Each structure stands twice: as C-alpha cells, then as structure tokens.
C-alpha cells in the first residue's frame, strides 16, 4: 500500500508548510512534461504526489489517514467491517492531478502555454490556435523555473506574466515578466521582474530582484552584463563577481578613475627639470683659475735703474765666458808647440856647426 508520507518524502509529524514544500518539489520533479522519455512512470508518480498532497494538506483527511489509512478515506474501516462513522460515507474521490497542480500554482498550470501568453501572437497577428488546443511539450517554457525556492503561505505560489511585444519608437520592442514567491512569512519573500527592449538592433534586458528588503538591478546588452546596482548604488565588486560567475569579461569601468593617472605625470614634471641647472654651473671653475696666474716679470725688468744695468755689464766683462776659456787654452798649446819646434831647429843648427869645426 502506498504511504503518502513516503511519496512526499516527509516525516509523519511534518508541518503543513513542510507538506506544501514537499509537494512543490515532487510535483515539478515528476510532471509528465519534464519526463518525456519516461512518461508512464512520471504520470503514475505525479498522480500519487497529487493524492498525497490532497490528503495530508487537509487536517481532517490527514487525521483519518493517520488512523485508518487510505481505506478510511474510501468509506470503509480496517478489518473488513465498518467500525467508525466515516465523514466520507460514500468514499472520497481524488481530483485530477492536473487540477491540483494548477490550483497550487495560483489557478494556472505553469507547464501550459496558456500560462505564458505568446508575445508574438499580437505582434505578428497569427495565433497558433485556440488556447485550449495548445498541447504541452518537452520544451515547456516553465522548465527554466524548476529551480525556484519553496513557496510559502500568504502569497501565490508562483505568479508571472508577459505583456505582448509592442512598438516603443525607434524600432524598439519590449516584453515583461515577473515572479514572486516566499517562504514562511515575509522574511524570505523574493520578487523577480525582467524587462527586455530591442532598440536600434540591440537587446537590452533589465532584471530587478527584490529579496529581504534589498533591490538588485542587472542590465544586459546583447547578453553581456553591463551594469549592476544594489539599492540604487552601482557596485563594481558585485559586477565583477557576477561577470566572473557568468564567464564574461568585466565591462570597462566608468571614466571617473581615468583622471587620476593623468594627474600623476603633471605632478611629476616639475621635479624632473630640477637637475638641469646643475650642468649650467660647471663653467664656474674656469673663472677661479684666472687669479692663479703669476704676474709677468717683464714689467719689473724694464723698471731696473741704469746704474744697476751698467754694473751688470762690467761684471760680465770681468768674468770670462765659457766660450773664452777654450780659445785661450788652445792658443797656449799652439804657442808651446811652435816654441819646441824652434828649439829643435836651433839645437840642430848648433850640432851642425860643431861638426864642421
């Protein structure tokens, strides 16, 4: 026999909020539109999930189920006999699981095309057929929302819609979608709205997320994140982090920081010309060398008195020069030779005279 608690994956003491969360998770998991390759199994599971939610979400039905099981809901007690007064004397009839699903999601089936108005119907003027004839398919638009967090009481489980495309001027087109959901109470409330504009051939998408009192706005251009603000203030760190998460390059920052580098060179210019005057002072040492030249002696020699000059001339006459000495000695030698020659001749004459005698 099927255990409804096991079908939803909750404990027997689970709260009504836990029952809702469990149904949302299991219904989206086993919806036939999401399981085209295993449709029969998905339909069986989807039906069990709807039955479990119908019983466990109603306090009276849950109490009977806890006491007598599913048979108590069918109008009979256990042990083959009727031992209690069942409020469902003729048995409880389960509703269509699709009806349960649509009711849970605000009266509309998120997997049907009726839930998402085709934005191109009115724009191109060719509806694909009556709303009731639109069939579900594996490529259902809602499959993108299967990862949304739990819905809570007090809010529609899921609410979204599109406005048809329309002209905005300058060849622009626009669409809009929104979603809101929350947990228990207002603390976990989250709202997402997305608007898309096609202006001058560029697709501008603005995504606004409001969660726990904080507003986050992301603006994309042709799929590239261009700006991100939190509570109306641009957050460059959050923008860079989101771009890294998406694997996109971080857009160029605003021109605000650019002037800062431009000021640095202007401030650095005055110090650089400072060393240039130093080489200009190098010729200074040439001026200092002029006083070191001694006075010329010529002017002092001209001022010597005439008497001193005459005394010097007399001294020069008294002292023979170096050139005179060699001439005197040479003369003496020559005179000595002539004298000896003459003496020899005289002696020869004397000898010859003696021999004659």
Swiss-Prot record:
Q: Which UniProt keywords apply?
A: Chaperone, Cytoplasm, Methylation, Nucleus
Where is region (Interaction with KRT18) located? 120-243
Organism's domain of life?
Eukaryota
Q: Which GO terms describe its molecular function?
A: ATPase activator activity; DNA binding; heat shock protein binding; Hsp70 protein binding; protein folding chaperone; protein-folding chaperone binding; unfolded protein binding
Biological process GO annotation list? actin cytoskeleton organization; chaperone-mediated protein folding; chorio-allantoic fusion; chorion development; extracellular matrix organization; intermediate filament organization; negative regulation of DNA-templated transcription; negative regulation of inclusion body assembly
Where, per the database record, does this protein carry Omega-N-methylarginine?
136
Record GO cellular component, one term:
perinuclear region of cytoplasm
Record InterPro entries: DnaJ_domain (IPR001623), DnaJ_domain_CS (IPR018253), DNJB2/6-like (IPR043183), J_dom_sf (IPR036869)
All copies of the J domain together span 3-69
Where is this gene product found?
Cytoplasm, Perinuclear region; Nucleus; Cytoplasm, Myofibril, Sarcomere, Z line
Residue segments, region Disordered: 243-357
Quote the Pfam families the UniProt record gives.
DnaJ
Its quaternary organisation is: Homooligomer. Interacts with BAG3, HSPB8 and STUB1. Interacts with ALKBH1. Interacts with HSP70, KRT18 and PTTG.
Q: What is this protein called?
A: DnaJ homolog subfamily B member 6
Instruction: Please name the source species.
Output: Rattus norvegicus
User: What is the organism lineage in this UniProt record?
Assistant: Eukaryota, Metazoa, Chordata, Craniata, Vertebrata
Q: Which gene encodes it?
A: Dnajb6
């Amino acid at each position: 026999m099927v255990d409804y608690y096991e079908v939803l994956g909750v404990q027997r003491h689970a709260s009504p909020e836990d029952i809702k969360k469990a149904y949302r998770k299991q219904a989206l998991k086993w919806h036939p539109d999401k399981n085209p390759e295993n449709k029969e199994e998905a339909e069986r599971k989807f039906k069990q999930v709807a039955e479990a939610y119908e019983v466990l979400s109603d306090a009276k039905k849950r109490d009977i189920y806890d006491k007598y099981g599913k048979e108590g809901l069918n109008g009979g007690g256990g042990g083959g006999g009727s031992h209690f007064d069942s409020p469902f004397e003729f048995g409880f009839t389960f509703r269509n699981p699709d009806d349960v699903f649509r009711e849970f999601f605000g009266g509309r089936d998120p997997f049907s095309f009726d839930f998402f108005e085709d934005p191109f119907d009115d724009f191109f003027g060719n509806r694909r057929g009556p709303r009731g004839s639109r069939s579900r398919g594996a490529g259902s638009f809602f499959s993108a929302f299967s990862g949304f967090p739990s819905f809570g009481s007090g809010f529609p489980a899921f609410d979204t819609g599109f406005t048809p495309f329309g002209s905005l001027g300058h060849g622009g087109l626009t669409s809009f979608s929104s979603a809101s959901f929350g947990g228990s109470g207002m603390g976990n409330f989250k709202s997402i709205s997305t608007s898309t504009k096609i202006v001058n051939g560029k697709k501008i998408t603005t995504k606004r997320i409001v969660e726990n009192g904080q507003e986050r706005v992301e603006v994309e251009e042709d799929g590239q994140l261009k700006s991100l603000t939190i509570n109306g203030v641009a957050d460059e760190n959050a923008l860079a982090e989101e771009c890294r998460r998406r694997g996109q390059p971080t857009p160029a920052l605003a021109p605000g920081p650019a002037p800062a580098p431009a000021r640095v060179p202007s401030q650095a210019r005055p110090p650089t010309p400072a060393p240039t005057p130093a080489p200009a002072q190098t010729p200074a040492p040439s001026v200092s060398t002029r006083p070191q030249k001694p006075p010329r002696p010529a002017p002092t020699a001209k001022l010597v008195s005439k008497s001193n000059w005459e005394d010097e001339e007399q001294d020069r006459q008294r002292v023979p020069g170096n050139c005179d000495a060699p001439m005197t000695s040479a003369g003496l030698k020559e005179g000595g030779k002539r004298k000896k020659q003459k003496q020899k001749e005289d002696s020869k004459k004397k000898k010859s005279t003696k021999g004659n005698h």
